[in-house]
């Protein structure tokens, strides 16, 4: 059987992977708008830090499963790991419907972290396997566009359902249907894509980086390579923004007088702009390089967060959410592509797993920072702190990240290295 790469050549399987990641996005989006308000208004949680515990559990578990999911997929294949991710998600709607206290919700989000860590990781790896190096940025852009488009739709749909029928159980019936759909597509229609990555690895002309042991990949992607370190820290800090949207936006905006349905629109605009623009920003990075959109995105997203705390009113908050979404669209798919460029095909899934581990640990770190800041100072103060973190991280990225685009790498200026780790790729 031929394992020739290319999106058009493999369009049927690529489309199924897009459907899969859309379902993954719907799953997390179904929680994003409703669950924090459920904790405050139904389960009686007053501390923002405690509300944030469900994001902490999600983030740290997803981070760990990202790491091992990539490793497992190179041993057992992408499809078994994808199916396992959907099986683990089956109890989540039941837990959310029946939860008598907030800690049940926190446990449910542990399962959500497993689902997202396995299912989304395998979906993006499969698209990279199918697309090949020439269309890698576009493939990742499509993946993230459909995934975060799903987040936006899930947030909006559950907001509408909650506004009409209540915070539970009806919104979580929608979630149950999404999980079943994702599982059926993964089991019945998705094919294994690992052979495409192996065929690509066989064609590599330079093999000095091939077949690195797991520990060496972990070391390189964490601190041994300056560019991968820059990507990992940027990925971790940008998740502070997403944690803020998940934890603080519903609480901050409903306290300011917006309805749950209106909050769903604000959060949906953030996710929708982020998702749709990635159809363009991934391809943009294939044309102009990865580094410019990543650096610009860090500062634009930080500005959007800052703007949210400064303005007042439904339409202004919606506009600020759109600005934040633009920044995330610029940086998010292209950070993944940077890692995909820098990694050898034989250990690319593991390298992406290490990056995604540090990136999604940012949910946990961000939830701690947001919760402590909100409880000690105010919810508004958490917006200022997250914006400052984005600006600082953007500066680090500007200094340390080199260009990784295969056609631009040799001619691009080298990033400044203030006694940091060396580039080894």
Regions found by a protein language model. Give the residues of each.
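Juxtamembrane intracellular "pre-TM" segments in multi-pass secondary transporters
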Residues: 1-11, 192-231, 416-425
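Helix-loop boundary and gating motifs at the non-cytosolic
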Residues: 8-59, 227-230, 234, 239-256
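Interfacial helix-cap and linker-helix signal at transmembrane-aqueous boundaries
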Residues: 39, 72-73, 160-166, 253-254, ...
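Residue-level signature of mid-helix packing/kink "hotspots" within the transmembrane helices
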Residues: 59-67, 151-152, 271-279, 363-364
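Helix-to-loop junctions at the C-terminal end of transmembrane segments
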Residues: 65-77, 277-289, 374
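Structural signature of the two symmetry-related core transmembrane helices
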Residues: 80-94, 292-307
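Cytoplasmic helix-loop-helix junction between adjacent transmembrane helices
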Residues: 108-149, 337-338
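Symmetry-related core transmembrane helices of the 12-TM Major Facilitator Superfamily/SLC fold
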Residues: 170-187, 383-399
């Amino acid at each position: 059987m031929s394992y020739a790469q290319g999106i058009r050549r493999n369009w049927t399987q690529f489309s199924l992977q897009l459907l899969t990641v859309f379902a993954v996005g719907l799953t997390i989006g179904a929680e994003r708008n409703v669950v924090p308000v459920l904790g405050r208004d139904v389960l009686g949680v007053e501390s923002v830090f405690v509300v944030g515990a469900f994001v902490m559990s999600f983030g740290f578990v997803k981070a760990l499963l990202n790491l091992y999911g990539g490793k497992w997929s190179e041993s057992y294949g992408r499809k078994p790991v994808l199916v396992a991710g959907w099986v683990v998600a089956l109890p989540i709607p039941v837990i959310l419907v029946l939860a008598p206290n907030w800690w049940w919700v926190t446990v449910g989000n542990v399962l959500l972290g497993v689902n997202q860590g396995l299912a989304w990781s395998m979906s993006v790896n499969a698209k990279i396997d199918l697309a090949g190096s020439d269309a890698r940025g576009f493939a990742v852009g499509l993946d993230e566009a459909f995934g975060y488009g799903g987040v936006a739709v899930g947030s909006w749909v559950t907001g509408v359902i909650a506004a009409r029928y209540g915070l539970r159980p009806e919104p979580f019936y929608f979630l149950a249907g999404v999980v079943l759909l994702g599982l059926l597509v993964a089991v019945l229609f998705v094919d294994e894509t690992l052979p495409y990555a192996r065929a690509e690895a066989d064609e590599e002309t330079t093999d000095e980086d091939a077949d690195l042991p797991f520990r060496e990949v972990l070391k390189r992607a964490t601190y041994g390579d300056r560019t991968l370190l820059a990507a990992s820290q940027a990925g971790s800090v940008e998740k502070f923004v997403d944690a803020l949207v998940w934890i603080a936006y519903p609480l901050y905006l409903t306290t300011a007088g917006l309805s749950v349905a209106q909050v769903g629109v604000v959060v949906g605009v953030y996710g929708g702009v982020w998702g749709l623009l990635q159809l363009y920003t991934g391809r943009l990075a294939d044309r102009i390089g990865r580094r410019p959109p990543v650096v610009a995105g860090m500062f634009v997203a930080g500005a959007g967060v800052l703007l949210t705390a400064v303005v007042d009113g439904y339409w202004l908050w919606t506009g600020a959410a759109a600005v934040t979404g633009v920044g995330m669209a610029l940086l998010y798919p292209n950070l993944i592509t940077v890692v995909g460029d820098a990694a050898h095909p034989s250990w690319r899934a593991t390298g992406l797993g290490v990056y995604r581990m540090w990136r999604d640990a940012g949910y946990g770190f961000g939830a701690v920072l947001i919760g402590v800041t909100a409880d000690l100072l105010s919810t508004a103060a958490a917006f200022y702190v997250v914006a400052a973190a984005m600006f600082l991280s953007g500066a680090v990225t500007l200094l340390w990240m080199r260009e990784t685009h295969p056609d631009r790498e040799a001619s691009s200026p080298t990033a400044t290295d203030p006694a940091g780790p060396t580039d080894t790729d």
